[in-house]
Design a protein with these regions (language model features):
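Conserved catalytic segments around the Walker B and adjacent sensor/switch elements
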Residues: 45-46, 65, 69-80
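Sensor-1/coupling segment of RecA-like P-loop NTPase cores
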Residues: 47-53, 107-112, 135-140, 148-176
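Helix-loop-helix "sensor" segment of P-loop NTPases
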Residues: 98, 118-123, 127, 150-152, ...
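Conserved P-loop NTPase "ATPase switch" module shared by AAA+ and STAND
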Residues: 20, 116-140, 144, 167
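C-terminal alpha-helical "lid" subdomain
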Residues: 213-214, 218-343
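Walker A/P-loop nucleotide-binding motif
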Residues: 42-65
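A short, basic N-terminal segment
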Residues: 1-41, 306-343
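Conserved NTP-binding/hydrolysis module of P-loop NTPases
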Residues: 11, 73, 83-102
Length: 343
């Protein structure tokens, strides 16, 4: 809707995992490098986790593009783990291009083993990637463990990559999955973007979509990062809504006011420390930035002086076990009283 207005060839902020728009920040480059190394070195079992919306699926699609571009690699990609064990093995065979006739689970396992041995003899790698792996039921996880046993005396026949939310780690830590856990050779947790990565991510998507100029102000990008916590999916949603509001308001530049309006509509709030970092960022900019920083310096000095003067009183007024055991404090310290002024 707004593409022509902003001089774009296509929507830059779709939430679909399009490898064309991939941005490889430091953490994403590290994750990709580990995945590629794990597959090429035939490590056998790899686990990658990340919070919802951090770009795991986009990265996996990019990995699949790279792997499928090699003649010596075959891949099977499972994006819906809600299958029975029987359907799971059948799905792997079909995705590997194996002609399957209806049979028993044993028939399927034998057919899979024969095809893996054939690939090994042809010096080919076979990779199974399971997305949303936190949704795997115990029976499927056990089956995956058994599949990881398919090997020769020198090499694993099947490279397995499990990708999921942090709940996957919690599942794998359960006592019943000890044997599976011991087979994991590589782990990686994909974090959210930092502020600079958020800026580069937005610029990268706009450039690929055909933008010839800057559309978001620095303040707008900072606000986007604060509101989204650096989560790529949320960045896409907020940027898309901001452009829509800007288009409706005939604004060719998206500033932080537009982003604020879009974020409020989407109920996106700043993080625990987001409000203060937002204030500090803006105090550091503009005509009176230097006076703002002087004020901060004086405030910090005041806090230090209070600690030096009342440190003994403050120390004796707390029962430190109360921080962990729920015991009540005796009095409010001077430092806390001072900080309450800013709350």
């Amino acid at each position: 809707m707004y593409e022509t207005f902003y001089g774009l060839k296509e929507n830059p902020f779709n939430v679909t995992p399009d490898p064309q728009f991939i941005y490889l920040g430091k953490s994403h480059r590290e994750a990709l490098a580990q995945l590629l190394y794990g597959v090429k070195a035939k490590k056998g079992f790899i686990v990658m986790t990340g919070e919802v919306g951090t770009g795991k699926t986009t990265l996996i699609h990019y990995l699949l593009e790279k792997l499928n571009g090699n003649d010596d690699t075959k891949t099977a990609f499972l994006f819906n783990p809600k299958l029975t064990v029987y359907d799971f093995i059948e799905y792997i065979l079909k995705d590997l291009g194996v002609v399957v006739q209806k049979g028993t689970k044993g028939d399927y396992l034998h057919l899979l083993h024969q095809n893996l041995l054939k690939a090994y003899q042809n010096d080919e790698k076979v990779v199974l990637i399971v997305d949303e792996a936190q949704g795997l039921n115990p029976a499927l996880l056990e089956e995956i463990r058994l599949l990881s046993n398919l090997e020769t005396s020198k090499s694993k026949l099947l490279q397995i990559v499990l990708v999921g939310q942090p709940e996957l780690n919690k599942t794998l830590e359960q006592p019943g999955f000890r044997q599976l856990r011991q087979r994991i050779n590589m782990r990686y947790h994909l974090p959210a973007f930092n502020g600079n990565e958020t800026k580069e991510y937005i610029a990268n998507r706009l450039r690929i979509a055909g933008a010839k100029r800057s559309i978001f102000t620095i303040g707008a990008i900072e606000e986007i990062h604060e509101r989204t916590g650096g989560i790529p999916r949320l960045i896409n949603i907020l940027c898309d809504n901001s452009l829509l509001i800007g288009y409706a308001s005939d604004k060719i530049i998206i500033d932080e006011k537009v982003v604020n309006e879009a974020a409020n509509d989407l109920k996106l709030r700043r993080g625990i420390f987001g409000t203060w970092s937002w204030i500090l960022l803006r105090m550091g900019r503009g005509l009176f930035g230097i006076w703002s920083w002087i004020f901060i310096g004086i405030s910090i000095t005041g806090v230090i002086l209070l600690i030096l003067q009342f440190g003994e009183t403050g120390y004796r007024s707390y029962n430190f076990t109360g921080w962990f055991g729920g015991l009540q404090r005796l009095v409010i310290t001077p430092l806390e009283r001072f900080l309450q002024f800013f709350r």
